[in-house]
Amino acid sequence: MSIKEKLASGQNVYGTMIRLQRNPAISFFAQNAGLDFLLYDCEHGSYNFETLHDIFVTGNAMGFDSFVRVAELSKDWISRALDCGATGIMVPMTETAEQAKEIVKWAKFTPVGDRGYGSGLAHSNYKGGGKHVDVMATQNNRVVVIAQIETGLAVENADAIAATEGIDVLLIGPNDLSISLGIPGDLMNQIEIDAIAKVAAACKKHGKAFGLHAGAKMHEIFKDDEQFRMLSTDLDLLASGFKNIKETLEQI
């Protein structure tokens, strides 16, 4: 069952963000652990498309989803990431319905969007030409489109963003949201919680998946609302793993 099918049936999906790891084998570790996806960060990470291509091809071959947070809303970023084999796109700082429509425009083929057709690339498992209709339909059905909500303006426009055809998930970026709301880093402030609740309500109203990439305390608050669940990063996992080695050995 694809991630979009899981979300449509009311199931939760689980993943984390990758900012450092470049070995395609990471997809095996994530799949073995029961995760549904990994999301590679091109907004704050240093990935290039050549590296991402190799990771995505591996994931696709084993039936594991690889998503990308692109650096910005643009045809170049979205279309190239998808042609490299990404099965989901997240655009940071999505603030308006107009921006949401532009995301869909570049992420979806006609009749939903205007994504350009690159023949025989990773997204079609390198199958040659003559399969346009099939490839386009498969991609439109599979690719997950995520609008990241990170500002007060985005919260104000959450209803319109959630109503946009082709947007599958609205995912909260709690750190930047707290900065925009004038409470930088105070993620459990009621102002932040209330803002996030408005986004969750908009998702429920329009039948879109609500997502969080946050700590355990915030997940606890919104556990009945969220479907697209993200915790931690590869950096956090490395740091905590090394710390655990030292602490464990000291106690023996």
PLM segments and residue spans:
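Conserved anion-binding
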Residues: 76, 88-165
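Alpha-helix-loop-beta-strand connector modules within alpha/beta enzyme cores
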Residues: 49-83, 105-113, 137-140, 188-211, ...
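Structural preference for beta-strand elements that scaffold enzyme active sites
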Residues: 13-15, 36-37, 65-67, 87-90, ...
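Glycine-rich tight-turn/loop motif centered on a GG-T
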Residues: 86-88, 109-119, 180-193, 232-234
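Catalytic cores of alpha/beta
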Residues: 28, 68, 73-87, 91, ...
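Conserved N-terminal beta1-alpha1 strand-loop-helix module at the mouth
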Residues: 1-66, 70-73, 105, 145, ...
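C-terminal helical cap(s) of enzyme catalytic domains, especially alpha/beta-barrels
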Residues: 55, 97-113, 234-252
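N-terminal amphipathic alpha-helix/helix-capping segment at the start of soluble metabolic enzymes
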Residues: 1-17, 129-141, 197-205
